Protein backbone atom coordinates (compact mmCIF):
# COMPACT_ATOMS: atom_id res chain seq x y z
CA UNK A 1 0.00 0.00 0.00
CA UNK A 2 1.03 3.59 -0.52
CA UNK A 3 2.78 5.24 2.42
CA UNK A 4 -0.05 7.74 2.77
CA UNK A 5 -2.74 5.04 2.98
CA UNK A 6 -5.10 5.57 5.86
CA UNK A 7 -3.83 3.60 8.87
CA UNK A 8 -7.13 1.75 9.31
CA UNK A 9 -6.69 0.17 5.86
CA UNK A 10 -3.16 -1.10 6.38
CA UNK A 11 -4.02 -4.23 8.35
CA UNK A 12 -7.03 -5.43 6.37
CA UNK A 13 -7.25 -8.97 5.03
CA UNK A 14 -7.86 -9.04 1.28
CA UNK A 15 -9.25 -12.22 -0.27
CA UNK A 16 -8.80 -12.60 -4.04
CA UNK A 17 -11.57 -14.20 -6.10
CA UNK A 18 -11.32 -15.28 -9.71
CA UNK A 19 -15.00 -15.94 -10.36
CA UNK A 20 -14.46 -18.47 -13.15
CA UNK A 21 -12.34 -20.74 -10.92
CA UNK A 22 -13.74 -19.98 -7.47
CA UNK A 23 -16.50 -22.59 -7.64
CA UNK A 24 -17.58 -25.33 -10.02
CA UNK A 25 -20.33 -23.03 -11.34
CA UNK A 26 -17.99 -20.07 -11.79
CA UNK A 27 -20.73 -17.48 -11.26
CA UNK A 28 -21.43 -14.45 -9.11
CA UNK A 29 -24.32 -16.34 -7.50
CA UNK A 30 -22.02 -19.22 -6.57
CA UNK A 31 -19.55 -16.79 -4.97
CA UNK A 32 -22.46 -15.32 -2.98
CA UNK A 33 -23.15 -18.78 -1.54
CA UNK A 34 -19.54 -18.91 -0.29
CA UNK A 35 -19.51 -15.55 1.51
CA UNK A 36 -19.94 -17.00 5.01
CA UNK A 37 -16.84 -19.16 4.55
CA UNK A 38 -14.87 -16.27 3.08
CA UNK A 39 -15.90 -14.03 5.99
CA UNK A 40 -14.95 -16.75 8.50
CA UNK A 41 -11.36 -16.58 7.21
CA UNK A 42 -11.11 -13.06 8.63
CA UNK A 43 -11.63 -11.38 5.28
CA UNK A 44 -12.23 -7.64 5.28
CA UNK A 45 -12.11 -6.96 1.56
CA UNK A 46 -12.95 -9.19 -1.40
CA UNK A 47 -10.89 -8.38 -4.49
CA UNK A 48 -12.32 -9.64 -7.75
CA UNK A 49 -9.94 -10.36 -10.58
CA UNK A 50 -11.35 -9.00 -13.88
CA UNK A 51 -15.11 -9.47 -14.08
CA UNK A 52 -15.55 -8.09 -17.60
CA UNK A 53 -16.25 -10.02 -20.80
CA UNK A 54 -13.18 -11.74 -22.24
CA UNK A 55 -12.23 -11.11 -25.85
CA UNK A 56 -12.41 -13.92 -28.38
CA UNK A 57 -10.01 -12.69 -31.07
CA UNK A 58 -6.53 -14.13 -30.51
CA UNK A 59 -7.63 -15.53 -27.14
CA UNK A 60 -5.17 -17.68 -25.26
CA UNK A 61 -6.37 -21.18 -24.54
CA UNK A 62 -9.96 -22.31 -24.82
CA UNK A 63 -11.26 -19.85 -22.21
CA UNK A 64 -9.16 -16.76 -22.86
CA UNK A 65 -7.44 -14.46 -20.41
CA UNK A 66 -9.53 -12.19 -18.15
CA UNK A 67 -6.97 -9.42 -18.69
CA UNK A 68 -7.99 -9.33 -22.38
CA UNK A 69 -11.02 -7.20 -21.57
CA UNK A 70 -13.75 -6.80 -24.17
CA UNK A 71 -15.95 -4.18 -22.46
CA UNK A 72 -15.06 -2.05 -19.44
CA UNK A 73 -18.66 -1.22 -18.57
CA UNK A 74 -20.33 -4.57 -18.10
CA UNK A 75 -19.80 -7.99 -16.57
CA UNK A 76 -18.79 -11.26 -18.18
CA UNK A 77 -22.09 -12.98 -19.07
CA UNK A 78 -20.51 -16.33 -18.17
CA UNK A 79 -20.36 -15.09 -14.56
CA UNK A 80 -23.85 -13.59 -14.52
CA UNK A 81 -25.57 -10.31 -15.19
CA UNK A 82 -24.72 -6.85 -13.94
CA UNK A 83 -27.68 -7.22 -11.56
CA UNK A 84 -26.20 -10.50 -10.27
CA UNK A 85 -22.94 -8.68 -9.56
CA UNK A 86 -24.70 -5.79 -7.83
CA UNK A 87 -26.59 -8.30 -5.68
CA UNK A 88 -23.32 -10.02 -4.79
CA UNK A 89 -21.77 -6.71 -3.73
CA UNK A 90 -24.83 -5.94 -1.58
CA UNK A 91 -24.40 -9.33 0.13
CA UNK A 92 -20.70 -8.65 0.66
CA UNK A 93 -21.57 -5.34 2.30
CA UNK A 94 -24.28 -6.98 4.43
CA UNK A 95 -21.58 -9.26 5.85
CA UNK A 96 -19.45 -6.24 6.77
CA UNK A 97 -16.89 -6.67 4.00
CA UNK A 98 -15.79 -4.34 1.21
CA UNK A 99 -15.43 -5.11 -2.48
CA UNK A 100 -12.77 -4.05 -4.96
CA UNK A 101 -12.37 -4.99 -8.60
CA UNK A 102 -9.46 -5.20 -10.99
CA UNK A 103 -9.39 -2.48 -13.61
CA UNK A 104 -7.16 -3.26 -16.55
CA UNK A 105 -6.69 0.12 -18.20
CA UNK A 106 -3.52 -0.36 -20.23
CA UNK A 107 -4.97 -2.61 -22.92
CA UNK A 108 -8.06 -4.42 -24.22
CA UNK A 109 -8.78 -7.46 -26.34
CA UNK A 110 -8.39 -6.89 -30.10
CA UNK A 111 -12.16 -7.32 -30.49
CA UNK A 112 -13.13 -4.94 -27.70
CA UNK A 113 -16.01 -2.56 -28.15
CA UNK A 114 -13.51 0.32 -27.95
CA UNK A 115 -11.46 -1.00 -30.87
CA UNK A 116 -14.57 -0.61 -33.02
CA UNK A 117 -16.17 2.48 -31.45
CA UNK A 118 -12.96 4.42 -30.75
CA UNK A 119 -10.04 3.08 -32.82
CA UNK A 120 -8.26 6.38 -32.13
CA UNK A 121 -7.80 5.26 -28.50
CA UNK A 122 -5.21 2.63 -29.46
CA UNK A 123 -1.47 2.33 -29.96
CA UNK A 124 -0.51 1.60 -33.56
CA UNK A 125 2.47 -0.37 -34.82
CA UNK A 126 4.64 1.08 -37.58
CA UNK A 127 2.41 -0.63 -40.17
CA UNK A 128 -0.64 1.24 -38.80
CA UNK A 129 -2.31 -1.80 -37.25
CA UNK A 130 -3.30 -2.13 -33.62
CA UNK A 131 -0.53 -3.57 -31.51
CA UNK A 132 1.07 -3.89 -28.13
CA UNK A 133 4.52 -3.31 -26.81
CA UNK A 134 4.93 -6.83 -25.38
CA UNK A 135 5.24 -9.23 -28.28
CA UNK A 136 4.04 -12.45 -26.66
CA UNK A 137 0.77 -10.87 -25.48
CA UNK A 138 -1.06 -11.58 -28.72
CA UNK A 139 -4.48 -11.44 -27.06
CA UNK A 140 -4.33 -7.72 -26.21
CA UNK A 141 -3.84 -4.35 -27.89
CA UNK A 142 -2.46 -1.37 -26.01
CA UNK A 143 -4.34 1.82 -25.31
CA UNK A 144 -2.75 5.17 -26.19
CA UNK A 145 -3.28 7.68 -23.41
CA UNK A 146 -1.97 10.59 -25.46
CA UNK A 147 -5.63 10.80 -26.52
CA UNK A 148 -7.33 12.80 -23.76
CA UNK A 149 -10.79 11.55 -24.79
CA UNK A 150 -9.63 8.10 -23.66
CA UNK A 151 -8.86 9.56 -20.23
CA UNK A 152 -12.42 10.83 -19.94
CA UNK A 153 -13.85 7.51 -21.12
CA UNK A 154 -11.92 5.65 -18.44
CA UNK A 155 -12.79 8.21 -15.75
CA UNK A 156 -16.47 7.79 -16.66
CA UNK A 157 -16.03 4.01 -16.42
CA UNK A 158 -14.47 4.31 -12.96
CA UNK A 159 -17.26 6.63 -11.80
CA UNK A 160 -19.83 4.08 -13.00
CA UNK A 161 -18.14 1.25 -11.08
CA UNK A 162 -17.52 3.43 -8.00
CA UNK A 163 -21.30 3.57 -7.55
CA UNK A 164 -21.20 -0.22 -7.07
CA UNK A 165 -17.85 -1.20 -5.51
CA UNK A 166 -15.63 0.25 -2.81
CA UNK A 167 -12.37 0.47 -4.72
CA UNK A 168 -10.08 -0.68 -7.47
CA UNK A 169 -6.87 -2.58 -8.02
CA UNK A 170 -5.21 -1.08 -11.06
CA UNK A 171 -3.38 -3.52 -13.28
Language-model-derived ranges and their functions:
Residues 3-13, 20-26, 32-44, 50-164:
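Substrate-binding/active-site clefts of carbohydrate-active enzymes
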Residues 15, 171:
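Rossmann-like NAD(H)/NADP(H) cofactor-binding core
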Residues 46, 168-170:
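Hydrophobic residues within beta-strands of alpha/beta enzymes
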Amino acid sequence: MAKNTEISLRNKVIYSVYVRNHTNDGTFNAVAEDLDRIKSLGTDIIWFMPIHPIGVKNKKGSLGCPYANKDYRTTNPEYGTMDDFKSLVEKIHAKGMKCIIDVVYNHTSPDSNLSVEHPEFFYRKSDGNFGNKVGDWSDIIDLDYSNKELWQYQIDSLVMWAKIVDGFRCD
